[in-house]
Amino acid sequence: MKHLIRRLSRVADSSSEFSIRRSTSSFRNRRGHHRLHAPPPPWSICPARRVNTVPAGHVPVYVGEEMERFVVSAELMNHPIFVGLLNRSAQEYGYAQKGVLHIPCHVIVFERVVETLRLGGFEGSGDLENLVASLLSGDELIPETTE
C-alpha cells in the first residue's frame, strides 16, 4: 500500500499532463482588488471537465470503465473505504500500472461514496453501508439515479 501511495505522489508531481497550482490563487475583481480563492475542502472531489490542473494535496484518478477523471483530496486516501478501493485497484491492475491511478468502481458509486465521506461519514446510512460492502466485495451495485 505504501508503494502505491508513493507512486501516486510521483505521478501527480511529475506528470507532464498535469500541472500543480498553489491552493490559493488570486485574481482581480471588477474594481481591481485582489481576492483569494479558498483552498478546496479536505474531502473534495472534482470532475476533470471542471479542473485542468491538480491542486496541491490532491491526486488525479480515473474511475470506472468510462475512465472518467477526478481530482481527489490526498486526505481521502487514508479513509478505510478508500483504502478498500485502492486495494481493489491493486488486485485488478497491479502495482505496476503507469500514469494516473485507476479505480475499478462505477462512477456513480464513487461519487456517492466521496459525497457521503464529505458530509460526515457512513454512520447510520444502511443503504450506503450495503453499497460499500458490495463495492469492496466485488459485487458492484449501481444505485438508481433520481434525475
From Swiss-Prot:
Subcellular location: Cytoplasm
One of the GO biological process terms: auxin transport
A GO cellular component entry from the record: cytoplasm
Main location: cytoplasm
Signal peptide: none
Pfam families: Auxin_inducible (PF02519)
Family: Belongs to the ARG7 family.
Protein task: Plays a role in the regulation of cell expansion, root meristem patterning and auxin transport.
Name this protein carries in UniProt: Auxin-responsive protein SAUR41
Organism: Arabidopsis thaliana (Mouse-ear cress)
